[in-house]
Protein backbone atom coordinates (compact mmCIF):
# COMPACT_ATOMS: atom_id res chain seq x y z
CA UNK A 1 0.00 0.00 0.00
CA UNK A 2 1.56 3.37 -0.97
CA UNK A 3 2.55 5.81 1.75
CA UNK A 4 0.25 8.77 2.20
CA UNK A 5 2.61 11.73 2.32
CA UNK A 6 0.15 14.07 4.03
CA UNK A 7 -0.22 11.94 7.13
CA UNK A 8 2.02 10.62 9.86
CA UNK A 9 1.28 7.38 11.70
CA UNK A 10 1.71 7.46 15.47
CA UNK A 11 2.41 4.33 17.46
CA UNK A 12 0.68 4.00 20.81
CA UNK A 13 1.38 1.28 23.30
CA UNK A 14 -1.11 -1.16 24.73
CA UNK A 15 0.39 -2.39 27.99
CA UNK A 16 0.25 -6.15 28.37
CA UNK A 17 -0.27 -8.06 31.58
CA UNK A 18 3.49 -8.46 31.97
CA UNK A 19 3.88 -4.68 31.86
CA UNK A 20 6.02 -4.76 28.71
CA UNK A 21 4.47 -2.45 26.15
CA UNK A 22 7.37 -1.05 24.17
CA UNK A 23 9.63 -2.85 21.76
CA UNK A 24 13.21 -3.56 22.74
CA UNK A 25 15.73 -1.11 21.33
CA UNK A 26 19.33 -2.26 21.19
CA UNK A 27 22.07 0.35 21.36
CA UNK A 28 25.68 0.15 20.26
CA UNK A 29 28.91 1.98 21.09
CA UNK A 30 29.19 2.61 17.35
CA UNK A 31 26.26 5.02 17.72
CA UNK A 32 28.71 7.63 19.02
CA UNK A 33 30.52 7.66 15.69
CA UNK A 34 27.34 8.25 13.72
CA UNK A 35 26.25 11.80 12.80
CA UNK A 36 23.64 11.93 15.58
CA UNK A 37 26.15 10.63 18.14
CA UNK A 38 28.72 13.22 17.08
CA UNK A 39 26.05 15.92 17.29
CA UNK A 40 25.27 14.89 20.87
CA UNK A 41 28.96 15.01 21.72
CA UNK A 42 28.96 18.60 20.43
CA UNK A 43 25.97 19.34 22.67
CA UNK A 44 27.79 17.82 25.64
CA UNK A 45 31.00 19.76 25.05
CA UNK A 46 29.36 23.11 24.31
CA UNK A 47 27.14 23.07 27.42
CA UNK A 48 30.06 21.88 29.55
CA UNK A 49 32.28 24.70 28.30
CA UNK A 50 29.48 27.24 28.82
CA UNK A 51 28.87 26.50 32.49
CA UNK A 52 32.59 25.91 33.17
CA UNK A 53 33.51 29.35 31.83
CA UNK A 54 30.87 31.01 33.97
CA UNK A 55 31.62 28.95 37.09
CA UNK A 56 35.35 29.64 36.88
CA UNK A 57 34.79 33.37 37.45
CA UNK A 58 31.51 33.23 39.40
CA UNK A 59 29.67 35.22 36.73
CA UNK A 60 26.18 33.92 37.47
CA UNK A 61 24.82 35.99 40.35
CA UNK A 62 21.11 36.81 40.45
CA UNK A 63 18.04 35.07 39.00
CA UNK A 64 19.05 35.53 35.35
CA UNK A 65 22.53 34.17 35.94
CA UNK A 66 21.10 31.30 37.97
CA UNK A 67 18.66 30.46 35.16
CA UNK A 68 21.44 30.34 32.59
CA UNK A 69 23.70 28.22 34.79
CA UNK A 70 20.82 25.82 35.50
CA UNK A 71 20.09 25.57 31.78
CA UNK A 72 23.62 24.61 30.82
CA UNK A 73 24.08 22.18 33.72
CA UNK A 74 20.70 20.53 33.12
CA UNK A 75 21.26 20.12 29.39
CA UNK A 76 24.76 18.76 29.96
CA UNK A 77 23.55 16.23 32.54
CA UNK A 78 20.66 14.85 30.49
CA UNK A 79 22.74 14.73 27.30
CA UNK A 80 25.36 12.74 29.21
CA UNK A 81 22.66 10.32 30.39
CA UNK A 82 21.41 9.86 26.82
CA UNK A 83 24.93 9.14 25.57
CA UNK A 84 25.55 6.62 28.36
CA UNK A 85 22.26 4.86 27.67
CA UNK A 86 23.05 4.56 23.97
CA UNK A 87 26.67 3.59 24.61
CA UNK A 88 25.63 0.77 26.94
CA UNK A 89 22.51 -0.25 25.00
CA UNK A 90 20.18 0.39 27.94
CA UNK A 91 17.26 1.85 26.00
CA UNK A 92 14.95 -1.05 26.90
CA UNK A 93 15.62 -0.49 30.61
CA UNK A 94 15.15 3.25 30.50
CA UNK A 95 12.05 4.20 32.56
CA UNK A 96 10.63 6.46 29.84
CA UNK A 97 9.74 5.79 26.22
CA UNK A 98 12.95 5.90 24.21
CA UNK A 99 10.85 6.50 21.11
CA UNK A 100 9.73 9.82 22.58
CA UNK A 101 12.27 10.92 25.21
CA UNK A 102 15.38 11.95 23.21
CA UNK A 103 13.56 14.25 20.79
CA UNK A 104 11.42 15.68 23.60
CA UNK A 105 14.53 16.57 25.54
CA UNK A 106 16.31 17.91 22.45
CA UNK A 107 13.41 20.27 21.77
CA UNK A 108 13.32 21.47 25.37
CA UNK A 109 17.11 21.85 25.40
CA UNK A 110 17.06 23.93 22.21
CA UNK A 111 14.49 26.26 23.78
CA UNK A 112 16.34 26.39 27.11
CA UNK A 113 19.65 27.23 25.45
CA UNK A 114 17.95 29.78 23.20
CA UNK A 115 16.48 31.52 26.24
CA UNK A 116 19.84 31.47 28.04
CA UNK A 117 21.59 32.81 24.94
CA UNK A 118 19.20 35.77 24.93
CA UNK A 119 18.58 36.38 28.64
CA UNK A 120 22.15 36.00 29.89
CA UNK A 121 23.80 38.65 27.67
CA UNK A 122 20.89 41.12 27.74
CA UNK A 123 20.13 41.08 31.48
CA UNK A 124 23.49 40.09 32.96
CA UNK A 125 26.56 40.35 30.72
CA UNK A 126 25.94 43.96 29.68
CA UNK A 127 26.16 45.04 33.32
CA UNK A 128 29.56 43.40 33.89
CA UNK A 129 32.61 45.63 33.86
CA UNK A 130 35.26 44.95 31.24
CA UNK A 131 37.66 42.27 32.33
CA UNK A 132 38.13 38.54 32.73
CA UNK A 133 34.62 37.88 34.03
CA UNK A 134 33.00 39.68 31.11
CA UNK A 135 35.19 37.86 28.59
CA UNK A 136 34.27 34.50 30.09
CA UNK A 137 30.59 35.43 30.10
CA UNK A 138 30.70 36.43 26.43
CA UNK A 139 32.46 33.18 25.54
CA UNK A 140 29.85 31.22 27.52
CA UNK A 141 27.11 32.95 25.53
CA UNK A 142 28.84 31.91 22.30
CA UNK A 143 28.97 28.25 23.36
CA UNK A 144 25.35 28.48 24.51
CA UNK A 145 24.41 29.52 20.98
CA UNK A 146 26.36 26.56 19.60
CA UNK A 147 24.46 24.23 21.94
CA UNK A 148 21.14 25.75 20.86
CA UNK A 149 21.94 25.14 17.19
CA UNK A 150 23.12 21.59 17.95
CA UNK A 151 19.92 20.68 19.81
CA UNK A 152 17.76 22.28 17.12
CA UNK A 153 19.65 20.28 14.51
CA UNK A 154 18.88 17.06 16.38
CA UNK A 155 15.20 17.94 16.38
CA UNK A 156 15.33 18.60 12.63
CA UNK A 157 17.11 15.29 12.01
CA UNK A 158 14.91 13.08 14.18
CA UNK A 159 11.45 14.59 13.78
CA UNK A 160 8.78 12.54 12.04
CA UNK A 161 8.44 12.64 8.29
CA UNK A 162 5.09 12.27 6.45
CA UNK A 163 4.12 8.61 6.17
CA UNK A 164 6.58 7.54 8.85
CA UNK A 165 5.58 5.35 11.82
CA UNK A 166 6.93 7.08 14.89
CA UNK A 167 6.25 8.23 18.45
CA UNK A 168 3.89 11.13 19.04
CA UNK A 169 6.56 13.48 20.42
CA UNK A 170 8.47 13.34 17.13
CA UNK A 171 5.52 14.79 15.22
CA UNK A 172 4.71 18.46 14.72
CA UNK A 173 1.89 18.40 17.34
CA UNK A 174 4.22 16.67 19.81
CA UNK A 175 6.95 19.25 19.31
CA UNK A 176 4.37 22.02 19.56
CA UNK A 177 3.38 20.62 22.96
CA UNK A 178 6.96 21.18 24.07
CA UNK A 179 6.87 24.75 22.77
CA UNK A 180 3.51 25.41 24.44
CA UNK A 181 4.66 24.23 27.86
CA UNK A 182 7.98 26.06 27.59
CA UNK A 183 6.34 29.35 26.64
CA UNK A 184 3.88 28.91 29.52
CA UNK A 185 6.80 28.47 31.93
CA UNK A 186 8.35 31.71 30.67
CA UNK A 187 4.99 33.43 31.17
CA UNK A 188 4.85 32.14 34.75
CA UNK A 189 8.33 33.57 35.36
CA UNK A 190 7.25 36.99 34.11
CA UNK A 191 4.08 37.05 36.23
CA UNK A 192 5.76 35.76 39.39
CA UNK A 193 5.05 39.15 40.98
CA UNK A 194 1.35 38.98 41.80
CA UNK A 195 0.86 42.76 41.61
CA UNK A 196 0.82 42.39 37.83
CA UNK A 197 -2.59 40.74 37.82
CA UNK A 198 -4.28 40.58 41.24
CA UNK A 199 -5.98 43.96 40.90
CA UNK A 200 -8.29 42.76 38.09
CA UNK A 201 -10.44 39.59 37.87
CA UNK A 202 -9.95 39.58 34.09
CA UNK A 203 -6.19 39.33 34.54
CA UNK A 204 -6.61 36.58 37.12
CA UNK A 205 -8.64 34.73 34.48
CA UNK A 206 -5.69 35.04 32.09
CA UNK A 207 -3.38 33.50 34.69
CA UNK A 208 -5.87 30.66 35.14
CA UNK A 209 -5.86 30.13 31.35
CA UNK A 210 -2.08 29.86 31.31
CA UNK A 211 -2.13 27.36 34.18
CA UNK A 212 -4.95 25.17 32.82
CA UNK A 213 -3.48 24.90 29.32
CA UNK A 214 -0.01 24.23 30.70
CA UNK A 215 -1.25 21.40 32.92
CA UNK A 216 -3.20 19.75 30.10
CA UNK A 217 -0.29 19.96 27.66
CA UNK A 218 2.10 18.63 30.31
CA UNK A 219 -0.24 15.69 30.93
CA UNK A 220 -0.21 14.86 27.21
CA UNK A 221 3.60 14.90 27.19
CA UNK A 222 3.91 12.78 30.34
CA UNK A 223 1.41 10.22 29.05
CA UNK A 224 3.52 9.76 25.93
CA UNK A 225 6.82 9.64 27.77
CA UNK A 226 5.40 7.08 30.18
CA UNK A 227 3.67 5.14 27.38
CA UNK A 228 0.43 5.11 29.33
CA UNK A 229 -1.94 6.86 26.94
CA UNK A 230 -4.36 3.96 27.39
CA UNK A 231 -5.18 5.03 30.97
CA UNK A 232 -7.42 7.83 29.73
CA UNK A 233 -11.18 7.21 29.83
CA UNK A 234 -11.42 8.54 26.26
CA UNK A 235 -9.35 7.72 23.15
CA UNK A 236 -6.03 9.56 23.16
CA UNK A 237 -6.62 11.21 19.74
CA UNK A 238 -9.91 12.62 21.04
CA UNK A 239 -8.12 13.93 24.12
CA UNK A 240 -5.51 15.68 21.97
CA UNK A 241 -8.11 17.25 19.68
CA UNK A 242 -10.20 18.44 22.61
CA UNK A 243 -7.11 19.78 24.36
CA UNK A 244 -6.02 21.77 21.31
CA UNK A 245 -9.49 23.20 20.68
CA UNK A 246 -10.03 24.14 24.32
CA UNK A 247 -6.60 25.78 24.52
CA UNK A 248 -7.24 27.82 21.37
CA UNK A 249 -10.49 29.15 22.81
CA UNK A 250 -8.98 29.92 26.21
CA UNK A 251 -5.89 31.60 24.82
CA UNK A 252 -8.04 33.68 22.48
CA UNK A 253 -9.74 35.21 25.52
CA UNK A 254 -6.39 35.81 27.21
CA UNK A 255 -5.00 37.49 24.09
CA UNK A 256 -7.85 39.99 24.24
CA UNK A 257 -8.06 40.54 28.00
CA UNK A 258 -4.38 40.75 28.96
CA UNK A 259 -3.40 43.67 26.67
CA UNK A 260 -6.74 45.38 27.25
CA UNK A 261 -6.42 45.48 31.04
CA UNK A 262 -2.66 46.05 31.08
CA UNK A 263 -2.28 48.82 28.48
CA UNK A 264 -5.68 50.56 28.16
CA UNK A 265 -6.17 53.46 30.57
CA UNK A 266 -9.94 52.90 30.57
CA UNK A 267 -9.35 49.60 32.34
CA UNK A 268 -6.57 50.77 34.64
CA UNK A 269 -3.67 49.91 32.36
CA UNK A 270 -0.45 51.77 31.58
CA UNK A 271 -0.17 52.56 27.86
CA UNK A 272 3.30 54.11 28.12
CA UNK A 273 6.47 52.56 29.46
CA UNK A 274 7.68 55.94 30.72
CA UNK A 275 4.89 56.01 33.30
CA UNK A 276 6.20 52.89 35.03
CA UNK A 277 8.65 54.07 37.68
CA UNK A 278 10.33 50.66 37.75
CA UNK A 279 11.39 51.21 34.12
CA UNK A 280 12.93 54.64 34.70
CA UNK A 281 16.46 53.25 34.76
CA UNK A 282 18.30 50.06 33.90
CA UNK A 283 18.65 47.46 36.62
CA UNK A 284 21.00 44.51 36.55
CA UNK A 285 19.29 41.11 36.67
CA UNK A 286 15.83 42.71 36.66
CA UNK A 287 13.00 43.16 34.15
CA UNK A 288 10.67 46.06 34.97
CA UNK A 289 6.90 45.71 35.32
CA UNK A 290 5.85 47.27 32.00
CA UNK A 291 8.32 45.12 30.08
CA UNK A 292 6.97 42.04 31.83
CA UNK A 293 3.42 42.93 30.84
CA UNK A 294 4.48 43.40 27.23
CA UNK A 295 6.45 40.15 27.22
CA UNK A 296 3.43 38.22 28.52
CA UNK A 297 1.22 39.75 25.81
CA UNK A 298 3.68 38.69 23.10
CA UNK A 299 4.12 35.21 24.56
CA UNK A 300 0.34 34.82 24.76
CA UNK A 301 0.09 35.51 21.03
CA UNK A 302 2.91 33.05 20.32
CA UNK A 303 1.23 30.30 22.31
CA UNK A 304 -2.13 30.95 20.66
CA UNK A 305 -0.49 30.49 17.25
CA UNK A 306 1.17 27.31 18.52
CA UNK A 307 -2.15 25.88 19.69
CA UNK A 308 -3.82 26.78 16.38
CA UNK A 309 -1.03 25.00 14.50
CA UNK A 310 -1.35 22.08 16.92
CA UNK A 311 -5.07 21.81 16.20
CA UNK A 312 -4.52 21.89 12.44
CA UNK A 313 -1.66 19.38 12.36
CA UNK A 314 -3.41 16.95 14.72
CA UNK A 315 -5.93 16.23 11.96
CA UNK A 316 -3.14 14.71 9.85
CA UNK A 317 -2.11 12.06 12.39
CA UNK A 318 -3.06 8.39 12.29
CA UNK A 319 -2.72 6.40 15.52
CA UNK A 320 -1.92 2.67 15.53
CA UNK A 321 -1.39 0.30 18.46
CA UNK A 322 1.77 -1.76 18.69
From Swiss-Prot:
Q: Where is this region: Disordered?
A: 1-25
Q: Where does the chain cross the membrane?
A: 41-61, 70-90, 101-121, 137-157, 171-191, 203-223, 239-259, 294-314
GO cellular component terms listed in the entry, alphabetical order:
cell-cell junction; plasma membrane
Sorted alphabetically, the keyword list is: Membrane, Phosphoprotein, Repeat, Transmembrane, Transmembrane helix
Q: Which residues form the MARVEL domain?
A: 31-163, 168-319
Looking up PROSITE patterns in the UniProt record yields: MARVEL
Q: How would you describe this protein's topology in the membrane?
A: Multi-pass membrane protein
The subcellular location is: Membrane
Coiled-coil regions listed: none
Modified positions (Phosphoserine) are 22
Q: Which GO terms describe its biological process?
A: negative regulation of heterotypic cell-cell adhesion
Family of this protein:
Belongs to the MAL family.
Name the chain's protein: Myeloid-associated differentiation marker
Give the originating organism: Pongo abelii
